């Protein structure tokens, strides 16, 4: 299992002028009530002023990180995780971190030696890594690198789940809970469009933890607030929810209303361009981003449960329709929409200026998430879309847990979890919880609540899943909703029933 915080929003930075700028950008998330878990800092060399002194180096840029331990402590006090970008120059890597380091061999080719270069920085409080480059490596070397960023951190923090966002890997990298992103793509509508089937196919290869640079990495003349928002909406339903790219201040949820795109850094890319001044004072962007940030955090109980299912079965979080509807030829052919878990259908809007989105609903009943309107499946429908709407549909029979809005995944709250029932069919759901940080779940320290909806009797039952136990400090208060009806309950570990 990856750490819970890795499923929160992640904000990447490029060139930073000073320590003060870095801290100010972090504080803006909390002041503006924009949920965020992770701040990612690019390395110098890939931008003029990143976290370190140069590509592949582990010394800090004193202009931005004059006292890195103090700065990391300040960011942690605001409940942010810190992820650092690292570049490898070697074309080969072999072995594991527990091997003896051979001084006669190149350091970067040996995980045991190379991880040692990370350790002093890691001990300052870094929470995760962003291993970039490595494209010339062969498959075995890529997997050795994936493995190093899983096993290396555990040498120093043996009961803390590592996080690493990789540029590359291969089938099998999922055994190290490796995240993958789609690379340095261009900011175009066509790029956004093709990312939907790319996401689906990546999951089908066995690599479930995938995402993209929201808005595309290289700005073009198509890079507008509209494209950014449509990409942001799509990314809210990817396992990795992360914004990154050149003209980096436009990657901030409030960045489209400041007049400042940040350092351009686009001269080396054919077809690159900055948005016109008319795009840089758009007050619509921030509230729409907030809407999808808050929705992502509300859906964390559902998403984390899907991650548990992925861990135990290999079934990806983003799913081709045919995984659940293999005998439906239309579902088999659709690559422009996907299932998120088993119960939510996501139809990203990928056409500029779209006011309608054609959506195929497989057999059974489906509810519009935004309006609760019910539709019969087995048909195409046209959904009206404005700029803030991406079509979402919930399967009849679904049991959908929605938590309270949080500003970060670890925020404590006494608010109950909403359990929304979508009638019209029987359904089941396993609500999975653990501490989100450690490996204790491997020893039985996890809480699973098995829920079953019986449509004919309008009854929801709950019971503790076999092999799990009640955990203190985890949500056990629920507001169960069926349409306009609502009932409060507290789950104590004993079988319970809610009847409507």
Label every PLM stretch briefly.
Residues 389-500:
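Accessory, solvent-exposed terminal regions and/or long lumenal/extracellular loops of proteins
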Residues 1-389, 394-395:
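Catalytic-domain carbohydrate-binding cleft regions of carbohydrate-active enzymes
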């Amino acid at each position: 299992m990856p750490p819970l915080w890795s499923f929160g929003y992640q904000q990447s930075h490029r060139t930073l002028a000073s320590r003060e700028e870095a801290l100010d950008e972090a504080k803006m998330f909390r002041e503006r009530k924009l949920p965020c878990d992770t701040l990612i800092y690019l390395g110098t060399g890939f931008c003029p002023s990143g976290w370190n002194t140069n590509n592949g180096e582990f010394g800090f840029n004193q202009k931005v990180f004059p006292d890195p331990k103090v700065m990391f402590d300040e960011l942690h006090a605001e409940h942010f995780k810190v992820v650092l970008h690292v570049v490898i120059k070697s074309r080969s890597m072999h072995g594991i971190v527990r091997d003896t380091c051979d001084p006669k061999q190149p350091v970067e080719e040996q995980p045991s030696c190379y991880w040692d270069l990370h350790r002093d920085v890691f001990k300052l409080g870094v929470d995760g890594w962003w291993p970039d480059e490595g494209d010339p490596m062969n498959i075995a070397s890529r997997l050795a690198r994936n493995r190093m960023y899983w096993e290396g951190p555990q040498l120093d923090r043996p009961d803390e789940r590592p996080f690493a966002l990789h540029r590359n890997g291969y089938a099998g990298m999922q055994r190290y809970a490796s995240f993958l992103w789609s690379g340095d793509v261009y900011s175009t509508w066509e790029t956004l469009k093709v990312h939907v089937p790319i996401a689906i196919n990546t999951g089908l290869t066995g690599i479930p933890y995938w995402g993209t640079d929201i808005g595309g990495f290289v700005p073009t003349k198509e890079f507008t607030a509209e494209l950014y928002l449509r990409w942001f909406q799509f990314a809210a339903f990817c396992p990795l929810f992360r914004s990154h790219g050149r003209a980096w201040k436009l990657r901030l949820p409030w960045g489209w209303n400041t007049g400042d795109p940040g350092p351009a850094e686009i001269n080396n890319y054919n077809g690159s361009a900055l948005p016109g001044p008319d795009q840089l004072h758009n007050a619509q962007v921030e509230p729409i981003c907030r809407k999808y940030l808050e929705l992502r955090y509300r859906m964390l109980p559902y998403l984390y449960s899907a991650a548990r299912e992925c861990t135990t079965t290999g079934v990806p979080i983003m799913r081709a329709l045919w995984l659940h509807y293999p005998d439906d030829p239309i579902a088999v052919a659709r690559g422009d929409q996907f299932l998120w878990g088993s119960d939510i259908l996501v139809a990203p809007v990928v056409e500029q200026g779209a006011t309608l989105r054609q959506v195929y609903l497989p057999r059974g009943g489906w509810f519009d998430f935004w309006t609760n309107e019910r539709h019969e499946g087995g048909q195409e429908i046209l959904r009206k879309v404005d700029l803030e709407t991406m079509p979402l549909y919930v399967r009849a029979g679904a049991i959908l847990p929605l938590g309270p809005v949080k500003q970060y995944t670890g925020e404590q709250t006494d608010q109950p979890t909403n359990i929304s029932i979508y009638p019209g069919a029987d359904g089941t759901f396993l609500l999975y919880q653990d501490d989100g940080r450690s490996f204790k779940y491997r020893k039985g320290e996890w809480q699973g609540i098995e829920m079953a909806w019986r449509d004919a009797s309008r009854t929801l039952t709950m019971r503790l899943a076999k092999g799990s136990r009640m955990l203190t400090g985890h949500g056990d208060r629920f507001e169960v909703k069926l349409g306009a009806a609502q009932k409060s309950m507290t789950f104590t570990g004993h079988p319970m029933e809610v009847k409507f």
